[in-house]
Amino acid sequence: MDTKQGVLDILNDLTGEDLSDQMDENIFDNGLMDSMASVQMLLSLQEKFDIDVPVSEFNRAEWDTPNKIVAKVESLENE
């Protein structure tokens, strides 16, 4: 499974929405995600992709669209 599909699967589980056609939509501004969902998302991403994203270092502006989430996960996978 590629990173994009894995991220979309997690977001679908958390939001109940297929976001594949909304890759640049802000998932916080449109009400699909809140702070509790952010924590769940980070935990799911860490488990699925074996990456480390401390909640204390989470900057919502860097993770607010599906495309940004995919890019962050890919950069953390390459560390």
UniProtKB/Swiss-Prot annotation:
GO cellular component: cytoplasm
Source organism superkingdom: Bacteria
Post-translation changes: 4'-phosphopantetheine is transferred from CoA to a specific serine of apo-DCP.
InterPro entries: ACP-like_sf, DltC, PP-bd_ACP
Transmembrane domains' residue ranges: none
Protein's UniProt keywords contain Cytoplasm: yes
Carrier domain boundaries: 1-77
Pathway in which the depicted protein is active: Cell wall biogenesis; lipoteichoic acid biosynthesis
Places the protein is found: Cytoplasm
GO biological process: cell wall organization; lipoteichoic acid biosynthetic process
Residue ranges that the Swiss-Prot or TrEMBL entry lists as coiled coil: none
Gene Ontology molecular functions: D-alanyl carrier activity
Pfam families: PP-binding
SUPFAM superfamilies in alphabetical order: ACP-like
Keywords noted in UniProt: Cell wall biogenesis/degradation, Cytoplasm, Phosphopantetheine, Phosphoprotein
Residues recorded as bearing O-(pantetheine 4'-phosphoryl)serine in the entry: S35
Purpose: Carrier protein involved in the D-alanylation of lipoteichoic acid (LTA). The loading of thioester-linked D-alanine onto DltC is catalyzed by D-alanine--D-alanyl carrier protein ligase DltA. The DltC-carried D-alanyl group is further transferred to cell membrane phosphatidylglycerol (PG) by forming an ester bond, probably catalyzed by DltD. D-alanylation of LTA plays an important role in modulating the properties of the cell wall in Gram-positive bacteria, influencing the net charge of the cell wall.
Family, per entry: Belongs to the DltC family.
Name this protein carries in UniProt: D-alanyl carrier protein
